[in-house]
A protein has these predicted regions:
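Histidine-anchored nucleotide/phosphate-binding helix
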Residues: 62, 83-101
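Active-site glycine-rich loop that binds ribose-phosphate moieties when present
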Residues: 135-154, 160-167
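C-terminal functional extensions of proteins
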Residues: 189-265
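Short glycine-rich or small-residue beta-strand-to-loop segments that form or flank ligand, phosphate
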Residues: 72-79, 101-105
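Long, charge-dense
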Residues: 93-146
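Gly/Ser/Thr-rich loops at beta-strand to alpha-helix junctions
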Residues: 79-88, 108-112, 164-167
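A short, gly/pro- and small-residue-rich
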Residues: 166-187
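Short, compositionally biased "basic patch" segments
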Residues: 8-66, 113-120
Length: 265
């Protein structure tokens, strides 16, 4: 099947290109069909949030950068969608923070998919990728997401889990990890369970975290710690929901009739 030509002038050019790329990567076996559904859900929330990083998400991304800088064993967990959408951003982040371990973790795990995800990351420039041949299991999880590397997620103190499912986020918290999620849905169980939920689109979030790391990496730990402590999870989630509500209220307000006085605000 050949991909359709998408004119650059199309108002949704970027979104259509991303979809076409994901569809191709599904045909190659990197992304699972369920990943396309997950992407559609993410897009819907991005629409509701205005398709840009909100000030609250930017603050959470700065805090995430601070947590990663302070962590002893920071790990970034990568699934099929993350590798397909953001391999370059993952590579850039691992360059900015060489201590960051990148680990493949799949819900729909097969040895072939684990290898494809690891290959995509290596091709993008990630020097070392764990999780292809997992060596341990996370307690209290029945799914294949429980498979982890003993030198990666199992010993991590801080774990970034983009596009995660709620069960594993919960299991990671139970295992004593500090969990940073990236999920456009503020209502998802993952966002609700993470100690630091980032409600933003994946590539935007990873770029902002990267910039935060570059900006703060020579700071005193106490100053970095102040940034890390500056964000409360419940406030991140309620501010995202308030933003959606205010935006919808504004958009749903009836157009003023010609000749009628304009509404204030
Ligand atoms: O590659 P695998 O086998 O590990 O499977 C990956 C998927 C994504 C299929 C699996 O983790 C899954 O089913 O995820 P969920 O439970 O659908 O959750 C994905 C969440 O990510 C949803 O809440 C979406 O709103 C959100 N999401 C999707 N795309 C983006 C996103 N959030 C931020 N940026 C995106 N680009």
């Amino acid at each position: 099947m050949t991909a359709p030509t998408i004119p650059r002038s199309h108002p949704r050019y970027r979104s259509l290109m991303v979809r076409s790329d994901l569809a191709e990567k599904m045909a190659e076996g990197l992304v699972v069909p369920e990943g396309l559904m997950a992407h559609g859900r993410g897009e819907a929330f991005d629409y509701l949030l205005g398709e840009k990083t909100t000030p609250e998400a930017a603050k959470a991304e700065r805090a995430a950068a601070a947590h990663l800088l302070l962590a002893r064993h920071p790990v970034l967990s990568v699934n099929g969608n993350v590798a397909a959408l953001a391999a370059a951003e993952v590579a850039s982040l691992s360059k900015s923070l060489p201590r960051l371990t990148v680990e493949v973790n799949l819900f729909h795990r097969t040895p072939d998919r684990a290898r494809r995800v690891a290959d995509a990351l290596r091709q993008a420039g990630v020097p070392t990728v764990l999780g292809e041949h997992p060596t341990a299991r996370l307690r209290g999880l029945a799914s294949d997401r429980a498979w982890v590397d003993a030198h990666g997620i199992l010993r991590a103190d801080v774990v970034v889990v983009p596009l995660e499912d709620g069960d594993r986020a919960e299991a990671l918290v139970r295992a004593g990890k500090f969990v940073i999620s990236v999920d456009l849905n503020p209502l998802s169980r993952t966002s609700q369970k993470a100690q630091l939920p980032i409600v933003d689109e994946l590539t935007r979030a990873l770029r902002h975290i990267d910039l935060g790391i570059l900006r703060m990496r020579r700071w005193e730990p106490s100053r970095i710690s102040t940034v890390a402590q500056s964000v409360e999870a419940p406030e991140v989630l309620s501010s995202a929901l308030r933003r959606i509500r205010v935006r919808l209220d504004r958009l749903a307000a009836p157009e003023p009739r010609r000749g009628s006085p304009r509404r204030a605000g």
